[in-house]
UniProtKB/Swiss-Prot annotation:
UniProt protein name: Hydroxyethylthiazole kinase
Functional summary from the UniProt entry: Catalyzes the phosphorylation of the hydroxyl group of 4-methyl-5-beta-hydroxyethylthiazole (THZ).
Classification via NCBIfam families: PRK09355.1, thiM
Positions bound to ATP: K118, T165
Gene3D superfamilies the UniProt entry points to: 3.40.1190.20
Length: 265
C-alpha cells in the first residue's frame, strides 16, 4: 500500500521548486498552497525564459485554464523542455471537452509527454474523444464505474499516470486502479481546488514516484479539506482553513486518515 505519510515527509524535507504555467484565476491560490505544503512555487509563462526555468525546476505543472496563443506556445515548449531535461510534468487539462482549443492543447501536451494527468470526469473523457461531458471547467456528469475505466484506459493509451477526480477519485498507471475516498463537499464551493491538486502533485512527483505522487497529493489535499471543514461551515473560512491544514498536517495524520484502496475494473 502507498505510504502517503512518507511521500509528504519527502516533500517537506526537500522543498522542491515547482514551475507552474497556470491560469490567471489560481496563480495566487496555487502558489500559497505549495508554500503551505512545504514546496517552493514559481509562476513563469514567458517563452523566452522557459529553458532557464525548466532547467532549475524540480517539476513542471501545465494548467490550460486560461489559454491564448502565447501561453499555448509556452506550454508546448515547456513540455518539450521537461522531456529534454528529464523533469516530471503534470498536466491539468482544465475545461478539455468544453472547447476544441482546450482539447487540442491538452492532447498536444499529452502526446509530447506528461508524467501525470489530473482532471475531472469530463476532462479525462475528452482525452479519449468522448464529448459533451464538460460544462465550463466543471464536469457535468460523473459515473464512478466509467471513471475507473477512464483512468485505466487513458493511462494505458498515453503511457502516463491518470487521476480522475470526483466524489471518489480514481488513479491508474494502466495496470492498477486506486480509489481515494477522502474529501468534503465544500471543495465544490471554492474555485481552483482541482488546480491546487495539480500544483501539489507537481511537488510530490518532484521527489516521489508518479503513482505514489498522484495518490498522495489527492489524499493530503482532501484530508486537509476534511480537517478544514471541521472548523469552518462556509466557503470563505473553509478556503482559508485549507491552507492552514496543508501546513499543519503531519505524515502521521495523513497515514491515519487516508482512505484508499486498490479496486477492480
Amino acid at each position: 500500500m502507498i505510504s502517503v505519510g512518507e511521500a509528504l515527509a519527502k516533500v517537506r524535507e526537500r522543498k522542491p521548486l515547482v514551475h507552474n504555467i497556470t491560469n490567471f484565476v489560481v496563480m495566487n491560490t496555487t502558489a500559497n498552497a505549495l508554500l503551505a505544503l512545504g514546496a517552493s512555487p514559481v509562476m513563469a509563462h514567458a517563452e523566452e525564459e522557459l529553458e532557464e526555468m525548466v532547467r532549475i525546476a524540480d517539476s513542471v505543472v501545465v494548467n490550460i485554464g486560461t489559454l491564448d496563443k502565447f501561453w499555448i506556445n509556452s506550454m508546448i515548449k515547456a513540455a518539450k523542455l521537461a522531456k529534454e531535461y528529464g523533469k516530471p510534468l503534470v498536466l491539468d487539462p482544465v475545461g478539455a471537452g468544453a472547447t476544441r482549443l482546450r482539447t487540442k492543447t491538452a492532447l498536444e501536451v499529452l502526446k509530447i509527454g506528461a508524467t501525470i494527468v489530473k482532471g475531472n470526469f469530463g476532462e479525462i473523457s475528452a482525452l479519449l474523444g468522448e464529448e459533451g461531458k464538460t460544462r465550463g471547467v466543471d464536469s457535468s456528469t460523473y459515473d464512478p464505474e466509467r471513471a475507473k475505466e477512464l483512468a485505466l484506459a487513458v493511462a494505458e493509451e498515453f503511457s502516463t499516470i491518470v487521476a480522475v477526480t470526483g466524489k471518489v477519485d480514481y488513479v491508474s498507471d494502466g495496470k492498477r486502479v486506486y480509489a481515494v475516498y477522502n474529501g468534503h463537499e465544500l471543495l465544490g464551493r471554492v474555485t481552483g481546488t482541482g488546480c491546487i491538486v495539480a500544483a501539489l502533485t507537481g511537488a510530490f512527483v518532484a521527489v516521489n514516484d508518479p503513482l505514489t505522487s498522484a495518490v498522495s497529493s489527492l489524499v493530503v489535499f482532501e484530508v486537509a479539506a476534511e480537517k478544514a471543514a471541521e472548523e469552518a461551515k462556509a466557503p470563505g473560512t473553509f478556503h482559508a482553513k485549507l491552507y492552514d491544514w496543508l501546513y499543519l498536517l503531519t505524515p502521521e495524520d495523513v497515514e491515519r486518515l487516508k482512505k484508499i484502496e486498490v479496486v477492480k475494473v
